[in-house]
Amino acid sequence: MLGMLRWTTAGESHGQALVATVEHMPAGVPVTKDEVTYQLARRRLGYGRGARMKFEQDKLTFLTGIRHGLTLGSPISIVIGNSEWPKWTTIMSSDALDMEDPENVAAMSSGRGAKLTRPRPGHADFAGMLKYGFDDARNVLERSSARETAARVAAATVARSFLRETLGVEVLSHVVSIGRSEPYEGPTPTFADITAIDESPVRSFGKEAEASMITEIEAAKKSGDTLGGIVEVIVEGLPIGLGSHISGEDRLDAQLAAALMGIQAIKGVEIGDGFEEARRRGSEAHDEMVRDEDGVYRTTNRAGGLEGGMTNGETLRVRAAMKPISTVPRALKTVDMATGDAATGIHQRSDVCAVPAAGVVAEAMVALVLARAVLNKFGGDSLEETTCNIRCYLERIGKRLEFNDGE
């Protein structure tokens, strides 16, 4: 849609750089490299991350769209350089290689340059090789790698700043469970708890749940296996009316679900109590409304802050389920695409568990979708104009909920 907030990423896992582009962000939104660096560092958090996290440091460049720490309203480009690029210049070269050069022949015939012909079950390798006509799975896995999410986190840092400046809201996440660990079932955390969550080695908000998750990760390590889990994203303070009931594509819950399902390895999404709602009677499932001197509020929040595709003023709660990482140290059965013979899946440097990081990526996608919804509702070429539009809307909503008391 013309004028809609858009974000795209480019780049390969072992390429020269990843690039994040954000279009139609209003002018005047503050953005700093320190904030982007902070969010990228959060993405690397987590017990069970592999040694590659020590290598994949993030070198930032603001290429376009930002001047003196403020957005210009023009397309924003953020470049994340690959610190390991010198090791990959031949293997990932964009130029054709001279295969009469002995050095090129040596680089491409062994080690990391050798063709990868044994697709990993659960990964994009097999379908990607067939769909695009590749005889080397590297042409698939370089882009399908979760390393790409670093660019999304960078793009979302701009969206986070926009939400903070316009609505005063923050996006946070925590890990609910990992594998078969005992799930966290305590009170919903708030943004005031983010430091405690990030200091947890598994980004858990409960010590008992944390201990159970760590035990599960250690067991998976010992058995040469990998783990998935469930993360929850929480946003407090959203105004009533983001999204719409008018059409399916306008529904905010549909947009959030699509964005979260677009994260590598995510296999399920639920809003609020989600699938548990299907087990309840109608009298138990919905959030009743009451009114006091402060306005209308809900006695529960089973809907997770969304009804009819729109925010209803309650806390937004969205959960995403991540499957176990596809690169399993105890390699799984596959077929060698070069010979048709039985084989085991290729092994790439990987993690045992990336669920804590998935929460940060989920935050990023929720922030981007919410920023788009805010701009669709309130417009504005500048931060000042958008904020003014929001203020007028909130005043109108507030007056509507006064019900002409005293008149």
Curated annotation (Swiss-Prot):
Q: How does it assemble?
A: Homotetramer.
The name this protein carries in UniProt is Chorismate synthase
GO molecular function per UniProt: chorismate synthase activity; FMN binding
Catalysed reaction(s)?
A: 5-O-(1-carboxyvinyl)-3-phosphoshikimate = chorismate + phosphate
- Residue numbers binding FMN: R143, S144, S145, Q264, A265, G308, K323, P324, I325, S326, T327, R349
Tell me the organism's taxonomic lineage. Answer: Bacteria, Bacillati, Actinomycetota, Actinomycetes, Mycobacteriales
Pfam families tied to this protein: Chorismate_synt
Organism of origin: Corynebacterium efficiens (strain DSM 44549 / YS-314 / AJ 12310 / JCM 11189 / NBRC 100395)
Detail the disulphide connectivity of this chain as listed in its UniProt entry: none
